[in-house]
Each structure stands twice: as structure tokens, then as C-alpha cells.
């Protein structure tokens, strides 16, 4: 029995399913989840001392790679001054100033402790600002596990094959209108009929929870136009894409300005952090300035601010994102070449330093239906073959992959060598 197998058996005694987030259980790929004990640079090391090139990156935050010395040093220094104060700090203000300078749409920002908190709070704020109840989201897009958003969500909910979660009252779900991603005509039709009841449209500008589906040409532009026409707040959920697709996130990359944005993952440098913000007029409705209540004991805690500030400063250097994107492109090109050579139907998607892998004969992946038509069974086999070759991919056919600045030519070669063997075995 491996050390991971023993630990998983032990974990299941007191942790539901043996994990603290469902996708970690390997249910969609089979087998025993790996238990990691160390991570450094582009690598993770499991409890049986096997090293893997890591394309999960703690589900996105580790854009600098694991254990960047400057980030660790900033956290150590803050540790000497205490863990949390429950009071304002200079670092909170510095973080707010930096985020607002990087993301042009952000005129004001509020720190929270997770991406779920950020999206939940942004939607409450949009409802309070507009006085409307309904929200529009898109099929296969995941915005955290708050009740009103677990309707036809993506990620682990796709893996489980259910459209929503038990325990969500029907009265909550009735205010959530779910439309097809990348279908602006459906948005136009819905808003023409019920636009006066809709508080906000929330969208992942790159859908990262049905693997990685970039926006179709004109889709984000159409959302902006329709929201302006009907007085609807446009929210970009940039928990995944923020500071990764480009320094300014997907909104910077695609040139679309939302009214509100949510961030997580990278903004905390690996610590539990989220934030939401946007137009001053809307943010002025949040307590203590306005009637929309939001609070959190650990919001803006100094350890997270230290890690996040250091990370954002490091990734702001000129050329950082171009280097990341180039590695990702070279890796995906290499995978495609090896799949083609083996005669395996395979297509990749990319948005900066995030990517999707699909076992599909389609020319491109644009819709939820395209995603669901891909061969999840073949992905299972590929996942384990890549593990055998020392490469750790997301353990789900519906999760995006992530690269870091720590990935280089050595890691690229390990990845492509493992893939060549894997594709050959999948013929």
C-alpha cells in the first residue's frame, strides 16, 4: 500500500470523502488521490517521494511557482508581527492601491477571504444597487458554492453529472437565469423579455470550470452593450483569469470594462484571499458607506496581504506574461503534434497562461455542448499515463490547467516525453 493510499483511508474516517474539496477525490479519473508533502518551483512531491511537473498550481494561485523565496520571506517577516489583528492595516491600503492601479475598471475594492465570498458579495451588491432580484449566469460556469450560483454550474458539478446541488432551495434558484455560454443572441432575447428584473450578469470571461473555453468573438462586447442598454450590472468573475490571462486579467486582455469584478487565487499569492470591486458609484453602496452589508473576521489579514502584495509586484515586471504565454503555447503545440502523430483526436484551448485539453475531433471548443461531447473516458486514461510519466494534470476533464513562470525547457521536455508515450498508448 502506498503512503497516499494509507493516508486516504485514514482521512475518510473523519473528513467527508477524505477531501476538503470534491475534485481532489479523483472521482472523475479514478484511483486514489495523491497526498502531497512538498512543493517547489514547477514541482510537487507526493508522500511516496515521487516528483511531478505541476500543471494544477494549487488550482491557479501559484503563478510564480511554488515557494517563491520573495513571497515566503514576506510572510516570514509578517509572522514576526502577528497573524491577524481584526483592524485596518497599512498593507490593506497598499493592496487596494495596487489592485486599482493594475485593473483599470477597479475604482474601489473590498478584500475578502475567498473567491466564493467575492462573487456572493458582488451579486448582493448588484442587487442592492439596482433594486432587482434576478441574475443571469452561464451554463457550465462556476462562481463558487453560494446557493444562488449552484445552478447548472461547472467544475466538480459537471464531474458529478448534476446540474445543481442538493440543499439549494427552489426559491433561491428561481432568481437565477442560466443561459448558454458564448450565445449573445440568448442574452439579447432574455433581456428583451425580462431585463427590467435583472440585477446583474455574472460571467467567467474565460470559462475555466468547463476546462478552458475562451469567449467567442463579440460575446463579451455584446454583454457590455446589452448591460448598458438594460441597466444591468456586468460582473466579470476573474477569480481564475485575474492577473493570469494578462496582468490586467481577461478584461485587460480583451479590452472590455465590467462594472464589478471579482478576484481570488493569485491576488493572495497562495494564501486564502479574494476581493471584489469596480465602479465607485456601485461600491459606495457597500457598508459602512451604504446599506448593502458585507463583513469578514479575516478579511485583509496581514499574512495574506503580505503574500499577495509581493506576488502582484513580481508579476508586474515587463515581459512576465509574455514569457508565461509563450511557454504555454509551446507546450500545447507540442501536445497537439504528438496527438496528431499518434492519430488521437485531440484539441487544446488557451487564454494566456491557462489552458484546456480535450479529447475531441472538433475544430474548436466554443460551447458547453462541445465540452460535454469530449471523451472524458479517454482523458481518465491520459491523466494516469501522464502521472506515470511524472506530470500532474488537473484530475478532471472539466478543469483548466495552469502554467507558472517556474516552468522552463526542462519541464517542457518532461511533459512532452510523457505525452508522447501516453498518446501512443491511447491509440
Curated annotation (Swiss-Prot):
* Biological process annotations from GO: protoporphyrinogen IX biosynthetic process
Q: What class of enzyme is it?
A: isomerase
* Top-rank taxon, per record: Bacteria
Annotated SUPFAM superfamilies: PLP-dependent transferases
Its UniProt entry gives the catalysed reaction(s) as:
(S)-4-amino-5-oxopentanoate = 5-aminolevulinate
- Enzyme Commission numbers on file: 5.4.3.8
Name the Gene3D superfamilies for this protein. Answer: Aspartate Aminotransferase, domain 1, Type I PLP-dependent aspartate aminotransferase-like (Major domain)
| PROSITE patterns per record | AA_TRANSFER_CLASS_3
| Entries under InterPro entries matching the protein | 4pyrrol_synth_GluAld_NH2Trfase (IPR004639), Aminotrans_3 (IPR005814), Aminotrans_3_PPA_site (IPR049704), PyrdxlP-dep_Trfase (IPR015424), PyrdxlP-dep_Trfase_major (IPR015421), PyrdxlP-dep_Trfase_small (IPR015422)
Q: Which GO terms describe its cellular component?
A: cytoplasm
Q: Where is the signal peptide?
A: none
Which cofactors are reported in the record for this sequence?
A: pyridoxal 5'-phosphate
Tell me the residues on which N6-(pyridoxal phosphate)lysine occurs.
265
NCBIfam families in the record: hemL (TIGR00713), PRK00062.1 (NF000818)
* Similarity comment: family membership: Belongs to the class-III pyridoxal-phosphate-dependent aminotransferase family. HemL subfamily.
What quaternary arrangement does the UniProt entry report? Homodimer.
Q: What is this protein called?
A: Glutamate-1-semialdehyde 2,1-aminomutase
Species this protein is from: Pseudomonas putida (strain ATCC 700007 / DSM 6899 / JCM 31910 / BCRC 17059 / LMG 24140 / F1)
Amino acid at each position: 500500500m502506498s503512503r497516499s493510499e494509507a493516508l486516504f483511508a485514514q482521512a475518510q474516517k473523519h473528513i467527508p470523502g477524505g477531501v476538503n474539496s470534491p475534485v481532489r477525490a479523483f472521482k472523475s479519473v479514478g484511483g486514489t488521490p495523491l497526498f502531497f508533502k512538498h512543493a517547489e518551483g514547477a514541482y510537487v512531491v507526493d508522500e511516496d517521494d515521487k516528483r511531478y511537473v505541476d500543471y494544477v498550481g494549487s488550482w491557479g494561485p501559484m503563478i510564480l511557482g511554488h515557494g517563491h523565496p520573495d513571497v515566503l520571506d514576506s510572510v516570514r517577516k509578517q509572522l514576526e508581527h502577528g497573524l491577524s489583528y481584526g483592524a485596518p492595516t497599512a498593507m490593506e491600503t497598499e493592496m487596494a492601491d495596487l489592485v486599482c492601479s493594475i485593473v483599470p475598471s477597479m475604482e474601489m475594492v473590498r478584500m475578502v477571504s475567498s473567491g466564493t465570498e467575492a462573487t456572493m458579495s458582488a451579486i448582493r451588491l448588484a442587487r442592492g444597487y439596482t433594486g432587482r432580484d434576478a441574475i443571469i449566469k452561464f451554463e457550465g460556469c462556476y462562481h463558487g458554492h453560494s446557493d444562488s450560483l449552484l445552478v447548472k454550474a461547472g467544475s466538480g458539478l459537471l464531474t458529478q453529472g448534476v446540474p445543481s446541488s442538493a440543499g439549494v432551495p427552489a426559491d433561491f434558484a428561481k432568481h437565477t437565469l442560466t443561459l448558454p455560454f458564448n450565445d449573445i443572441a440568448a442574452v439579447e432575447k432574455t433581456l428583451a423579455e425580462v431585463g427590467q428584473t435583472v440585477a446583474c450578469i455574472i460571467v467567467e470571461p474565460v470559462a475555466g470550470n468547463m476546462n478552458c473555453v475562451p469567449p467567442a468573438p463579440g460575446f463579451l462586447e455584446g454583454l457590455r452593450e446589452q448591460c448598458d442598454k438594460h441597466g444591468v450590472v456586468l460582473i466579470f468573475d476573474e477569480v481564475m483569469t485575474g492577473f493570469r490571462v494578462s496582468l490586467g486579467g481577461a478584461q485587460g486582455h480583451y479590452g472590455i470594462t465590467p462594472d464589478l469584478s471579482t478576484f481570488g487565487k493569485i491576488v493572495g499569492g497562495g494564501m486564502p484571499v479574494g476581493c471584489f470591486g469596480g465602479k465607485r458609484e456601485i461600491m459606495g453602496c457597500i457598508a459602512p458607506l451604504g446599506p448593502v452589508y458585507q463583513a469578514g473576521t479575516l478579511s485583509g489579514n496581514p499574512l495574506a496581504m503580505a503574500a499577495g502584495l509581493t506576488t502582484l509586484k513580481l508579476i508586474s515586471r515587463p515581459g512576465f506574461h509574455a514569457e508565461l504565454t509563450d511557454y504555454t503555447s509551446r507546450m500545447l503545440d507540442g501536445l497537439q503534434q504528438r496527438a496528431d502523430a499518434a492519430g488521437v483526436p485531440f484539441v487544446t484551448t488557451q487564454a494566456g497562461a491557462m489552458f484546456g485539453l480535450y479529447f475531441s475531433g472538433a475544430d474548436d471548443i466554443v460551447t458547453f455542448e462541445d465540452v460535454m461531447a469530449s471523451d472524458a473516458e479517454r482523458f481518465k486514461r491520459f491523466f494516469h499515463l501522464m502521472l506515470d510519466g511524472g506530470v500532474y494534470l488537473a484530475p478532471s476533464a472539466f478543469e483548466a490547467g495552469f502554467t507558472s513562470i517556474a516552468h522552463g525547457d526542462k519541464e517542457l521536455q518532461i511533459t512532452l516525453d510523457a505525452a508522447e508515450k501516453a498518446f501512443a498508448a491511447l491509440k
